[in-house]
Amino acid sequence: MRRLIILAEVALGLLFASCTKEEQRTLSVIPAPLKVELQQEVFSLNSETGLYIDASEGDKKILEDYLVASSMNLKPVIAEEGHNVVLKQVAELPEVNSSEGYVLTVTPDQVLIRATSGAGLFYGVQTMLQMVDEKGLPAGVITDEPRFAYRGFMMDVSRHFFDKEFIKKQMDALAYYKLNRLHLHLTDAAGWR
């Protein structure tokens, strides 16, 4: 009788363990955004996907060069309508409290990144680049801003030499993960001569 009870408990345990919830979409972005609302649709990247940037001239040039060289193969367009990635610098963005914050909205027809500064647009682009997979970009709305104003990395170049190319790669990695300071530890001497 006791074996039967144990067998029934094991069977029930296995039965309940095999029941799963509906698969939820997760987002692998570092650092994790403040607010994520994903949907089932996808924005598909194709040869017709363009890039439209509405920002100050300096920010526009930097962002355009960066995205054209990225793995997304975007080409600049002169109108925001169409199957495009759109970056807009706006005067106000009530959803965020930081100039480095952004709102990334992805629909099946368009990707829209809004921010109040070039830095906010850049960090929105980093999130978008981390989200891209073989299917495209998952639809949804991401609202994000940094939790800390100073997000840095220290590299000790006083005790070990790093060449210029290595430091550039490190800077690209820091930007990808939205770190905004590179501290180069140049010397251990008490004075700088």
Give the residues covered by each predicted segment.
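Bacterial Sec-dependent N-terminal signal peptides
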Residues: 1-28
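Acidic, contiguous N-terminal accessory segments
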Residues: 19-151
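Flexible loop/turn segments at secondary-structure boundaries
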Residues: 59, 161-162, 189-193
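The substrate-binding groove and active-site-proximal loops of carbohydrate-active enzymes
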Residues: 115, 151-164
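Catalytic alpha/beta active-site cores
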Residues: 151, 171, 184-185
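Short, acidic/polar
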Residues: 162-174
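Aromatic-lined carbohydrate-binding/catalytic grooves of carbohydrate-active enzymes
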Residues: 177-193
